Amino acid sequence: MGLNPTQVSTSGSPQVSQPATGVLDPRTGQPVGADDRYFLEINHELSDKGFFVAAADDLITWARTGSLMWMTFGLACCAVEMMQVSMPRYDVERFGFAPRASPRQSDVMIVAGTLTNKMAPALRKVYDQMPEPRYVISMGSCANGGGYYHYSYSVVRGCDRIVPVDIYVPGCPPTAEALLYGVLLLQKKIRRIGTIER
C-alpha cells in the first residue's frame, strides 16, 4: 500500500495533513497578489498581443521584484521562523527571494531578534556594505521596538534607530506566514515606488 506524500501512517490508519494553502490576504481571503493591477495589466497585454510595451523603469522594477536576494541578520529566536520560511512547506524562493551569505550580494536584510547596543554598530556596518537600492525587513517585536526587553539598559528600542526600515513584521515570534506576507508587501512596495525614486 503506497502512501500519498501528505499522509502519515500511525497505528494502522493513515492521517492526512493539511496541504499548504499559500499566503491569503486577510481582507479578501484571496491569495496575495490576485488582485494586483500591475500583474493583471501585464497578463492581459501578453495574452492579447504576445508582447508588451513598457518603460525601462517598469521593466527594471519587474526584474527587481522577482530576484530579491536577502541576507540574514538573525539575532534571537525569530531566526528560527526565518529559517522555516526557506524550508519546503513555504519555499520563499518560488517568489524570487533567495538567500545570500554576503551583504555585497544582497538587496534585502532581515533583522530578526533583539538588537543590543553592542551589536548596533555591526548592524550599521553590514547595512552600509549592501549595494543600492537596499531594503530592510524588521522581523519580530524585539527588532520592531525592543519587545520583551524594551526597558533593558542594553537593548536598542527598535532597529529603525540604526537603519531605515521598509517593512515591519509583528509577532513574538512572527510566524513564517507573517514573514512571507512581509516579503510580498516589500515586492508590492518596490513595484509602487520603483527603483529610480529610491
Curated annotation (Swiss-Prot):
GO MF annotation, one: NADH:ubiquinone reductase (non-electrogenic) activity
Intrachain disulfide bonds: none
InterPro entries attached to this UniProt entry: NADH_UbQ_OxRdtase-like_20kDa, NADH_UQ_OxRdtase_20Kd_su
Keyword match 4Fe-4S: yes
Topological relation to the membrane, as annotated: Peripheral membrane protein
GO CC annotations on file: plasma membrane; respiratory chain complex I
Residue segments, region Disordered: 1-29
Binding locations of [4Fe-4S] cluster: C77, C78, C142, C172
Residue stretches of biased makeup (Polar residues): 1-20
Superkingdom classification of source: Bacteria
Protein's UniProt name: NADH-quinone oxidoreductase subunit B
Species this protein is from: Afipia carboxidovorans (strain ATCC 49405 / DSM 1227 / KCTC 32145 / OM5)
Lineage: Bacteria, Pseudomonadati, Pseudomonadota, Alphaproteobacteria, Hyphomicrobiales
